[in-house]
Each structure stands twice: as structure tokens, then as C-alpha cells.
Amino acid sequence: MKSVAIVGLGWLGLPLALHLKELGWCVKGSKQSPDDAQKLHQLGIETYPFSLSDEMKRLPDHIRPLFNVDALIITLPPSRFSSQQYCEYLAFLANQAKKQGVQHLIFTSSTSVFPDISGQFDESSQLSAETEMGKTLIQAEQCLFQSGISHCDILRLAGLIGKQRHPVKFLAGKRNLKQGNSPVNLVHLEDCIQAITALLMNPNGLRTYHLCAPIHPTRAEYYTKAAVFYDLSIPQFECSDSDPKRIIMADKICRDLGFAYRYPNPDDMLEKRSDF
């Protein structure tokens, strides 16, 4: 039986773990809280209380089995850390994984590694982040590619949508929102899970892939439609011809792995109200 550890059993990591368990994988994972770890044990996921910190570098003996797996998936964002801290912690995780014979590492990065300017950005485009998170992720990607693990995949995710998570919740009723004519770059949770599974099943050296729905309505068009669908106050956008037309190109994974988006159109990501 193949085994995998997911560092970060959160909004993406937990449903991914449950999906892989259904496919017959032996799944381990981590949560910050011992209470949360115990709850996930009851779901059949071997869960360890573990968080990125200086303390983790002492790696207590009861945590070591987390790294005794075939593959390691890291889904933790850098939001709580300085760039230096985050990269040091990821380097430590990768080093521990390599020491214990892990052959495959998958890291969920973000399309924020690209600037908010007009253009089409694919996996070969020059990285030039504008946000601190984006700059940190660029360093993290480089760090993990240099880890020495045989197979390492960087999966850059566009804006995330899924059960009980939709950007319109935060935009509803707001006025004077910028860049109404800019296209959206979004991806559904289910597509994230399916893409990571495809990578897991097909390790093949060092790879970078984007994940983003191939249809890109404007922000004003899409979030107006979403607000109407969910019966929320319609957000008011300022629209200009000069709004940046930033498009994330994400068809390489389709060509290389035969991946097919279940949600190619953001309109299809609108869920029934009971799940919102």
C-alpha cells in the first residue's frame, strides 16, 4: 500500500486526505492542535500534532513516523511567517523527508508569484511577485527544488473556491471596488484534489504546474452574477479599459497528465445555497 503524509490538514488538506484514503492510500497528516489531531484520528487518518516553528526542529520522537511515507504533500501557506522563517521550515521538512527516504514531494504554491499586470502567464513565465506572500513563495519553490528529493512538484493554485468558500462573501455590498474589467483566475477545490492525485500517481522528476479554470469572465461580471445567485448585495465595481488583463494559463497539466478540469467555467463553481 502506498503511503502519503499531508502537512496541513486544513481546507484543502483534509478533503484531499479523505479522497486518497478512499483510493486505498495509507494517509498520515498534521494539525496544530492535539485535540484536532485526535478528532481526525477518528476519521481513520493517522494525525500528528505538529506546526511550523523553531521547536519542531527538535522533532520529538512521536512525530518522526509522519515522515515514514512514500510521498509528502505540503499545503501550508506562508501567511504567519517571515520569508526567512517559512523557507527555513520548509527546508527542514524536506530534509527530514529525504532522510527517511521520501521519494516524492508536492508543494501547493500560488499564482501570486506573478505580477498583477496584463499578460498571459504560463509555467515558463518570469516570476515577479508584487506581494510579500508571492515573494516568499518564489523563494520556497526554489528551496524545495534544491532539496535533493527525486521527484518534486510545485502546483501553483489560482484563487480557491469550494464548499463554503467563495470570494463574493467578502465582496458583497462593497462599493468602488477596483479592476472591474480584470479577468478572474479561479480554481475549484475538487480540481485541486484531482490534480494533486494525478501528480501523486505519476511522479516524474522536477515539475511546475499551474491550476486555474480556463474560462475568465471579468470581476464585475462574475461577482455580480454570484451575488445575485446567492441573494447577496451586489458589489459595485469601477471598470476601466486600463484594468490589467492578467490571465493564468494552466493547460500544461492537461497536456502532460491527461488532466481534465471538472469546473472549467467559474459559473459552474456556484454551489447550491445550502452549501454556501
Q: What is each of the regions a protein language model found here?
A:
Residues 13-14:
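N-terminal Rossmann-fold NAD(P) dinucleotide-binding loop
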Residues 92-130:
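Conserved Rossmann-fold NAD(P)-dependent oxidoreductase catalytic core, especially the SDR/UDP-sugar
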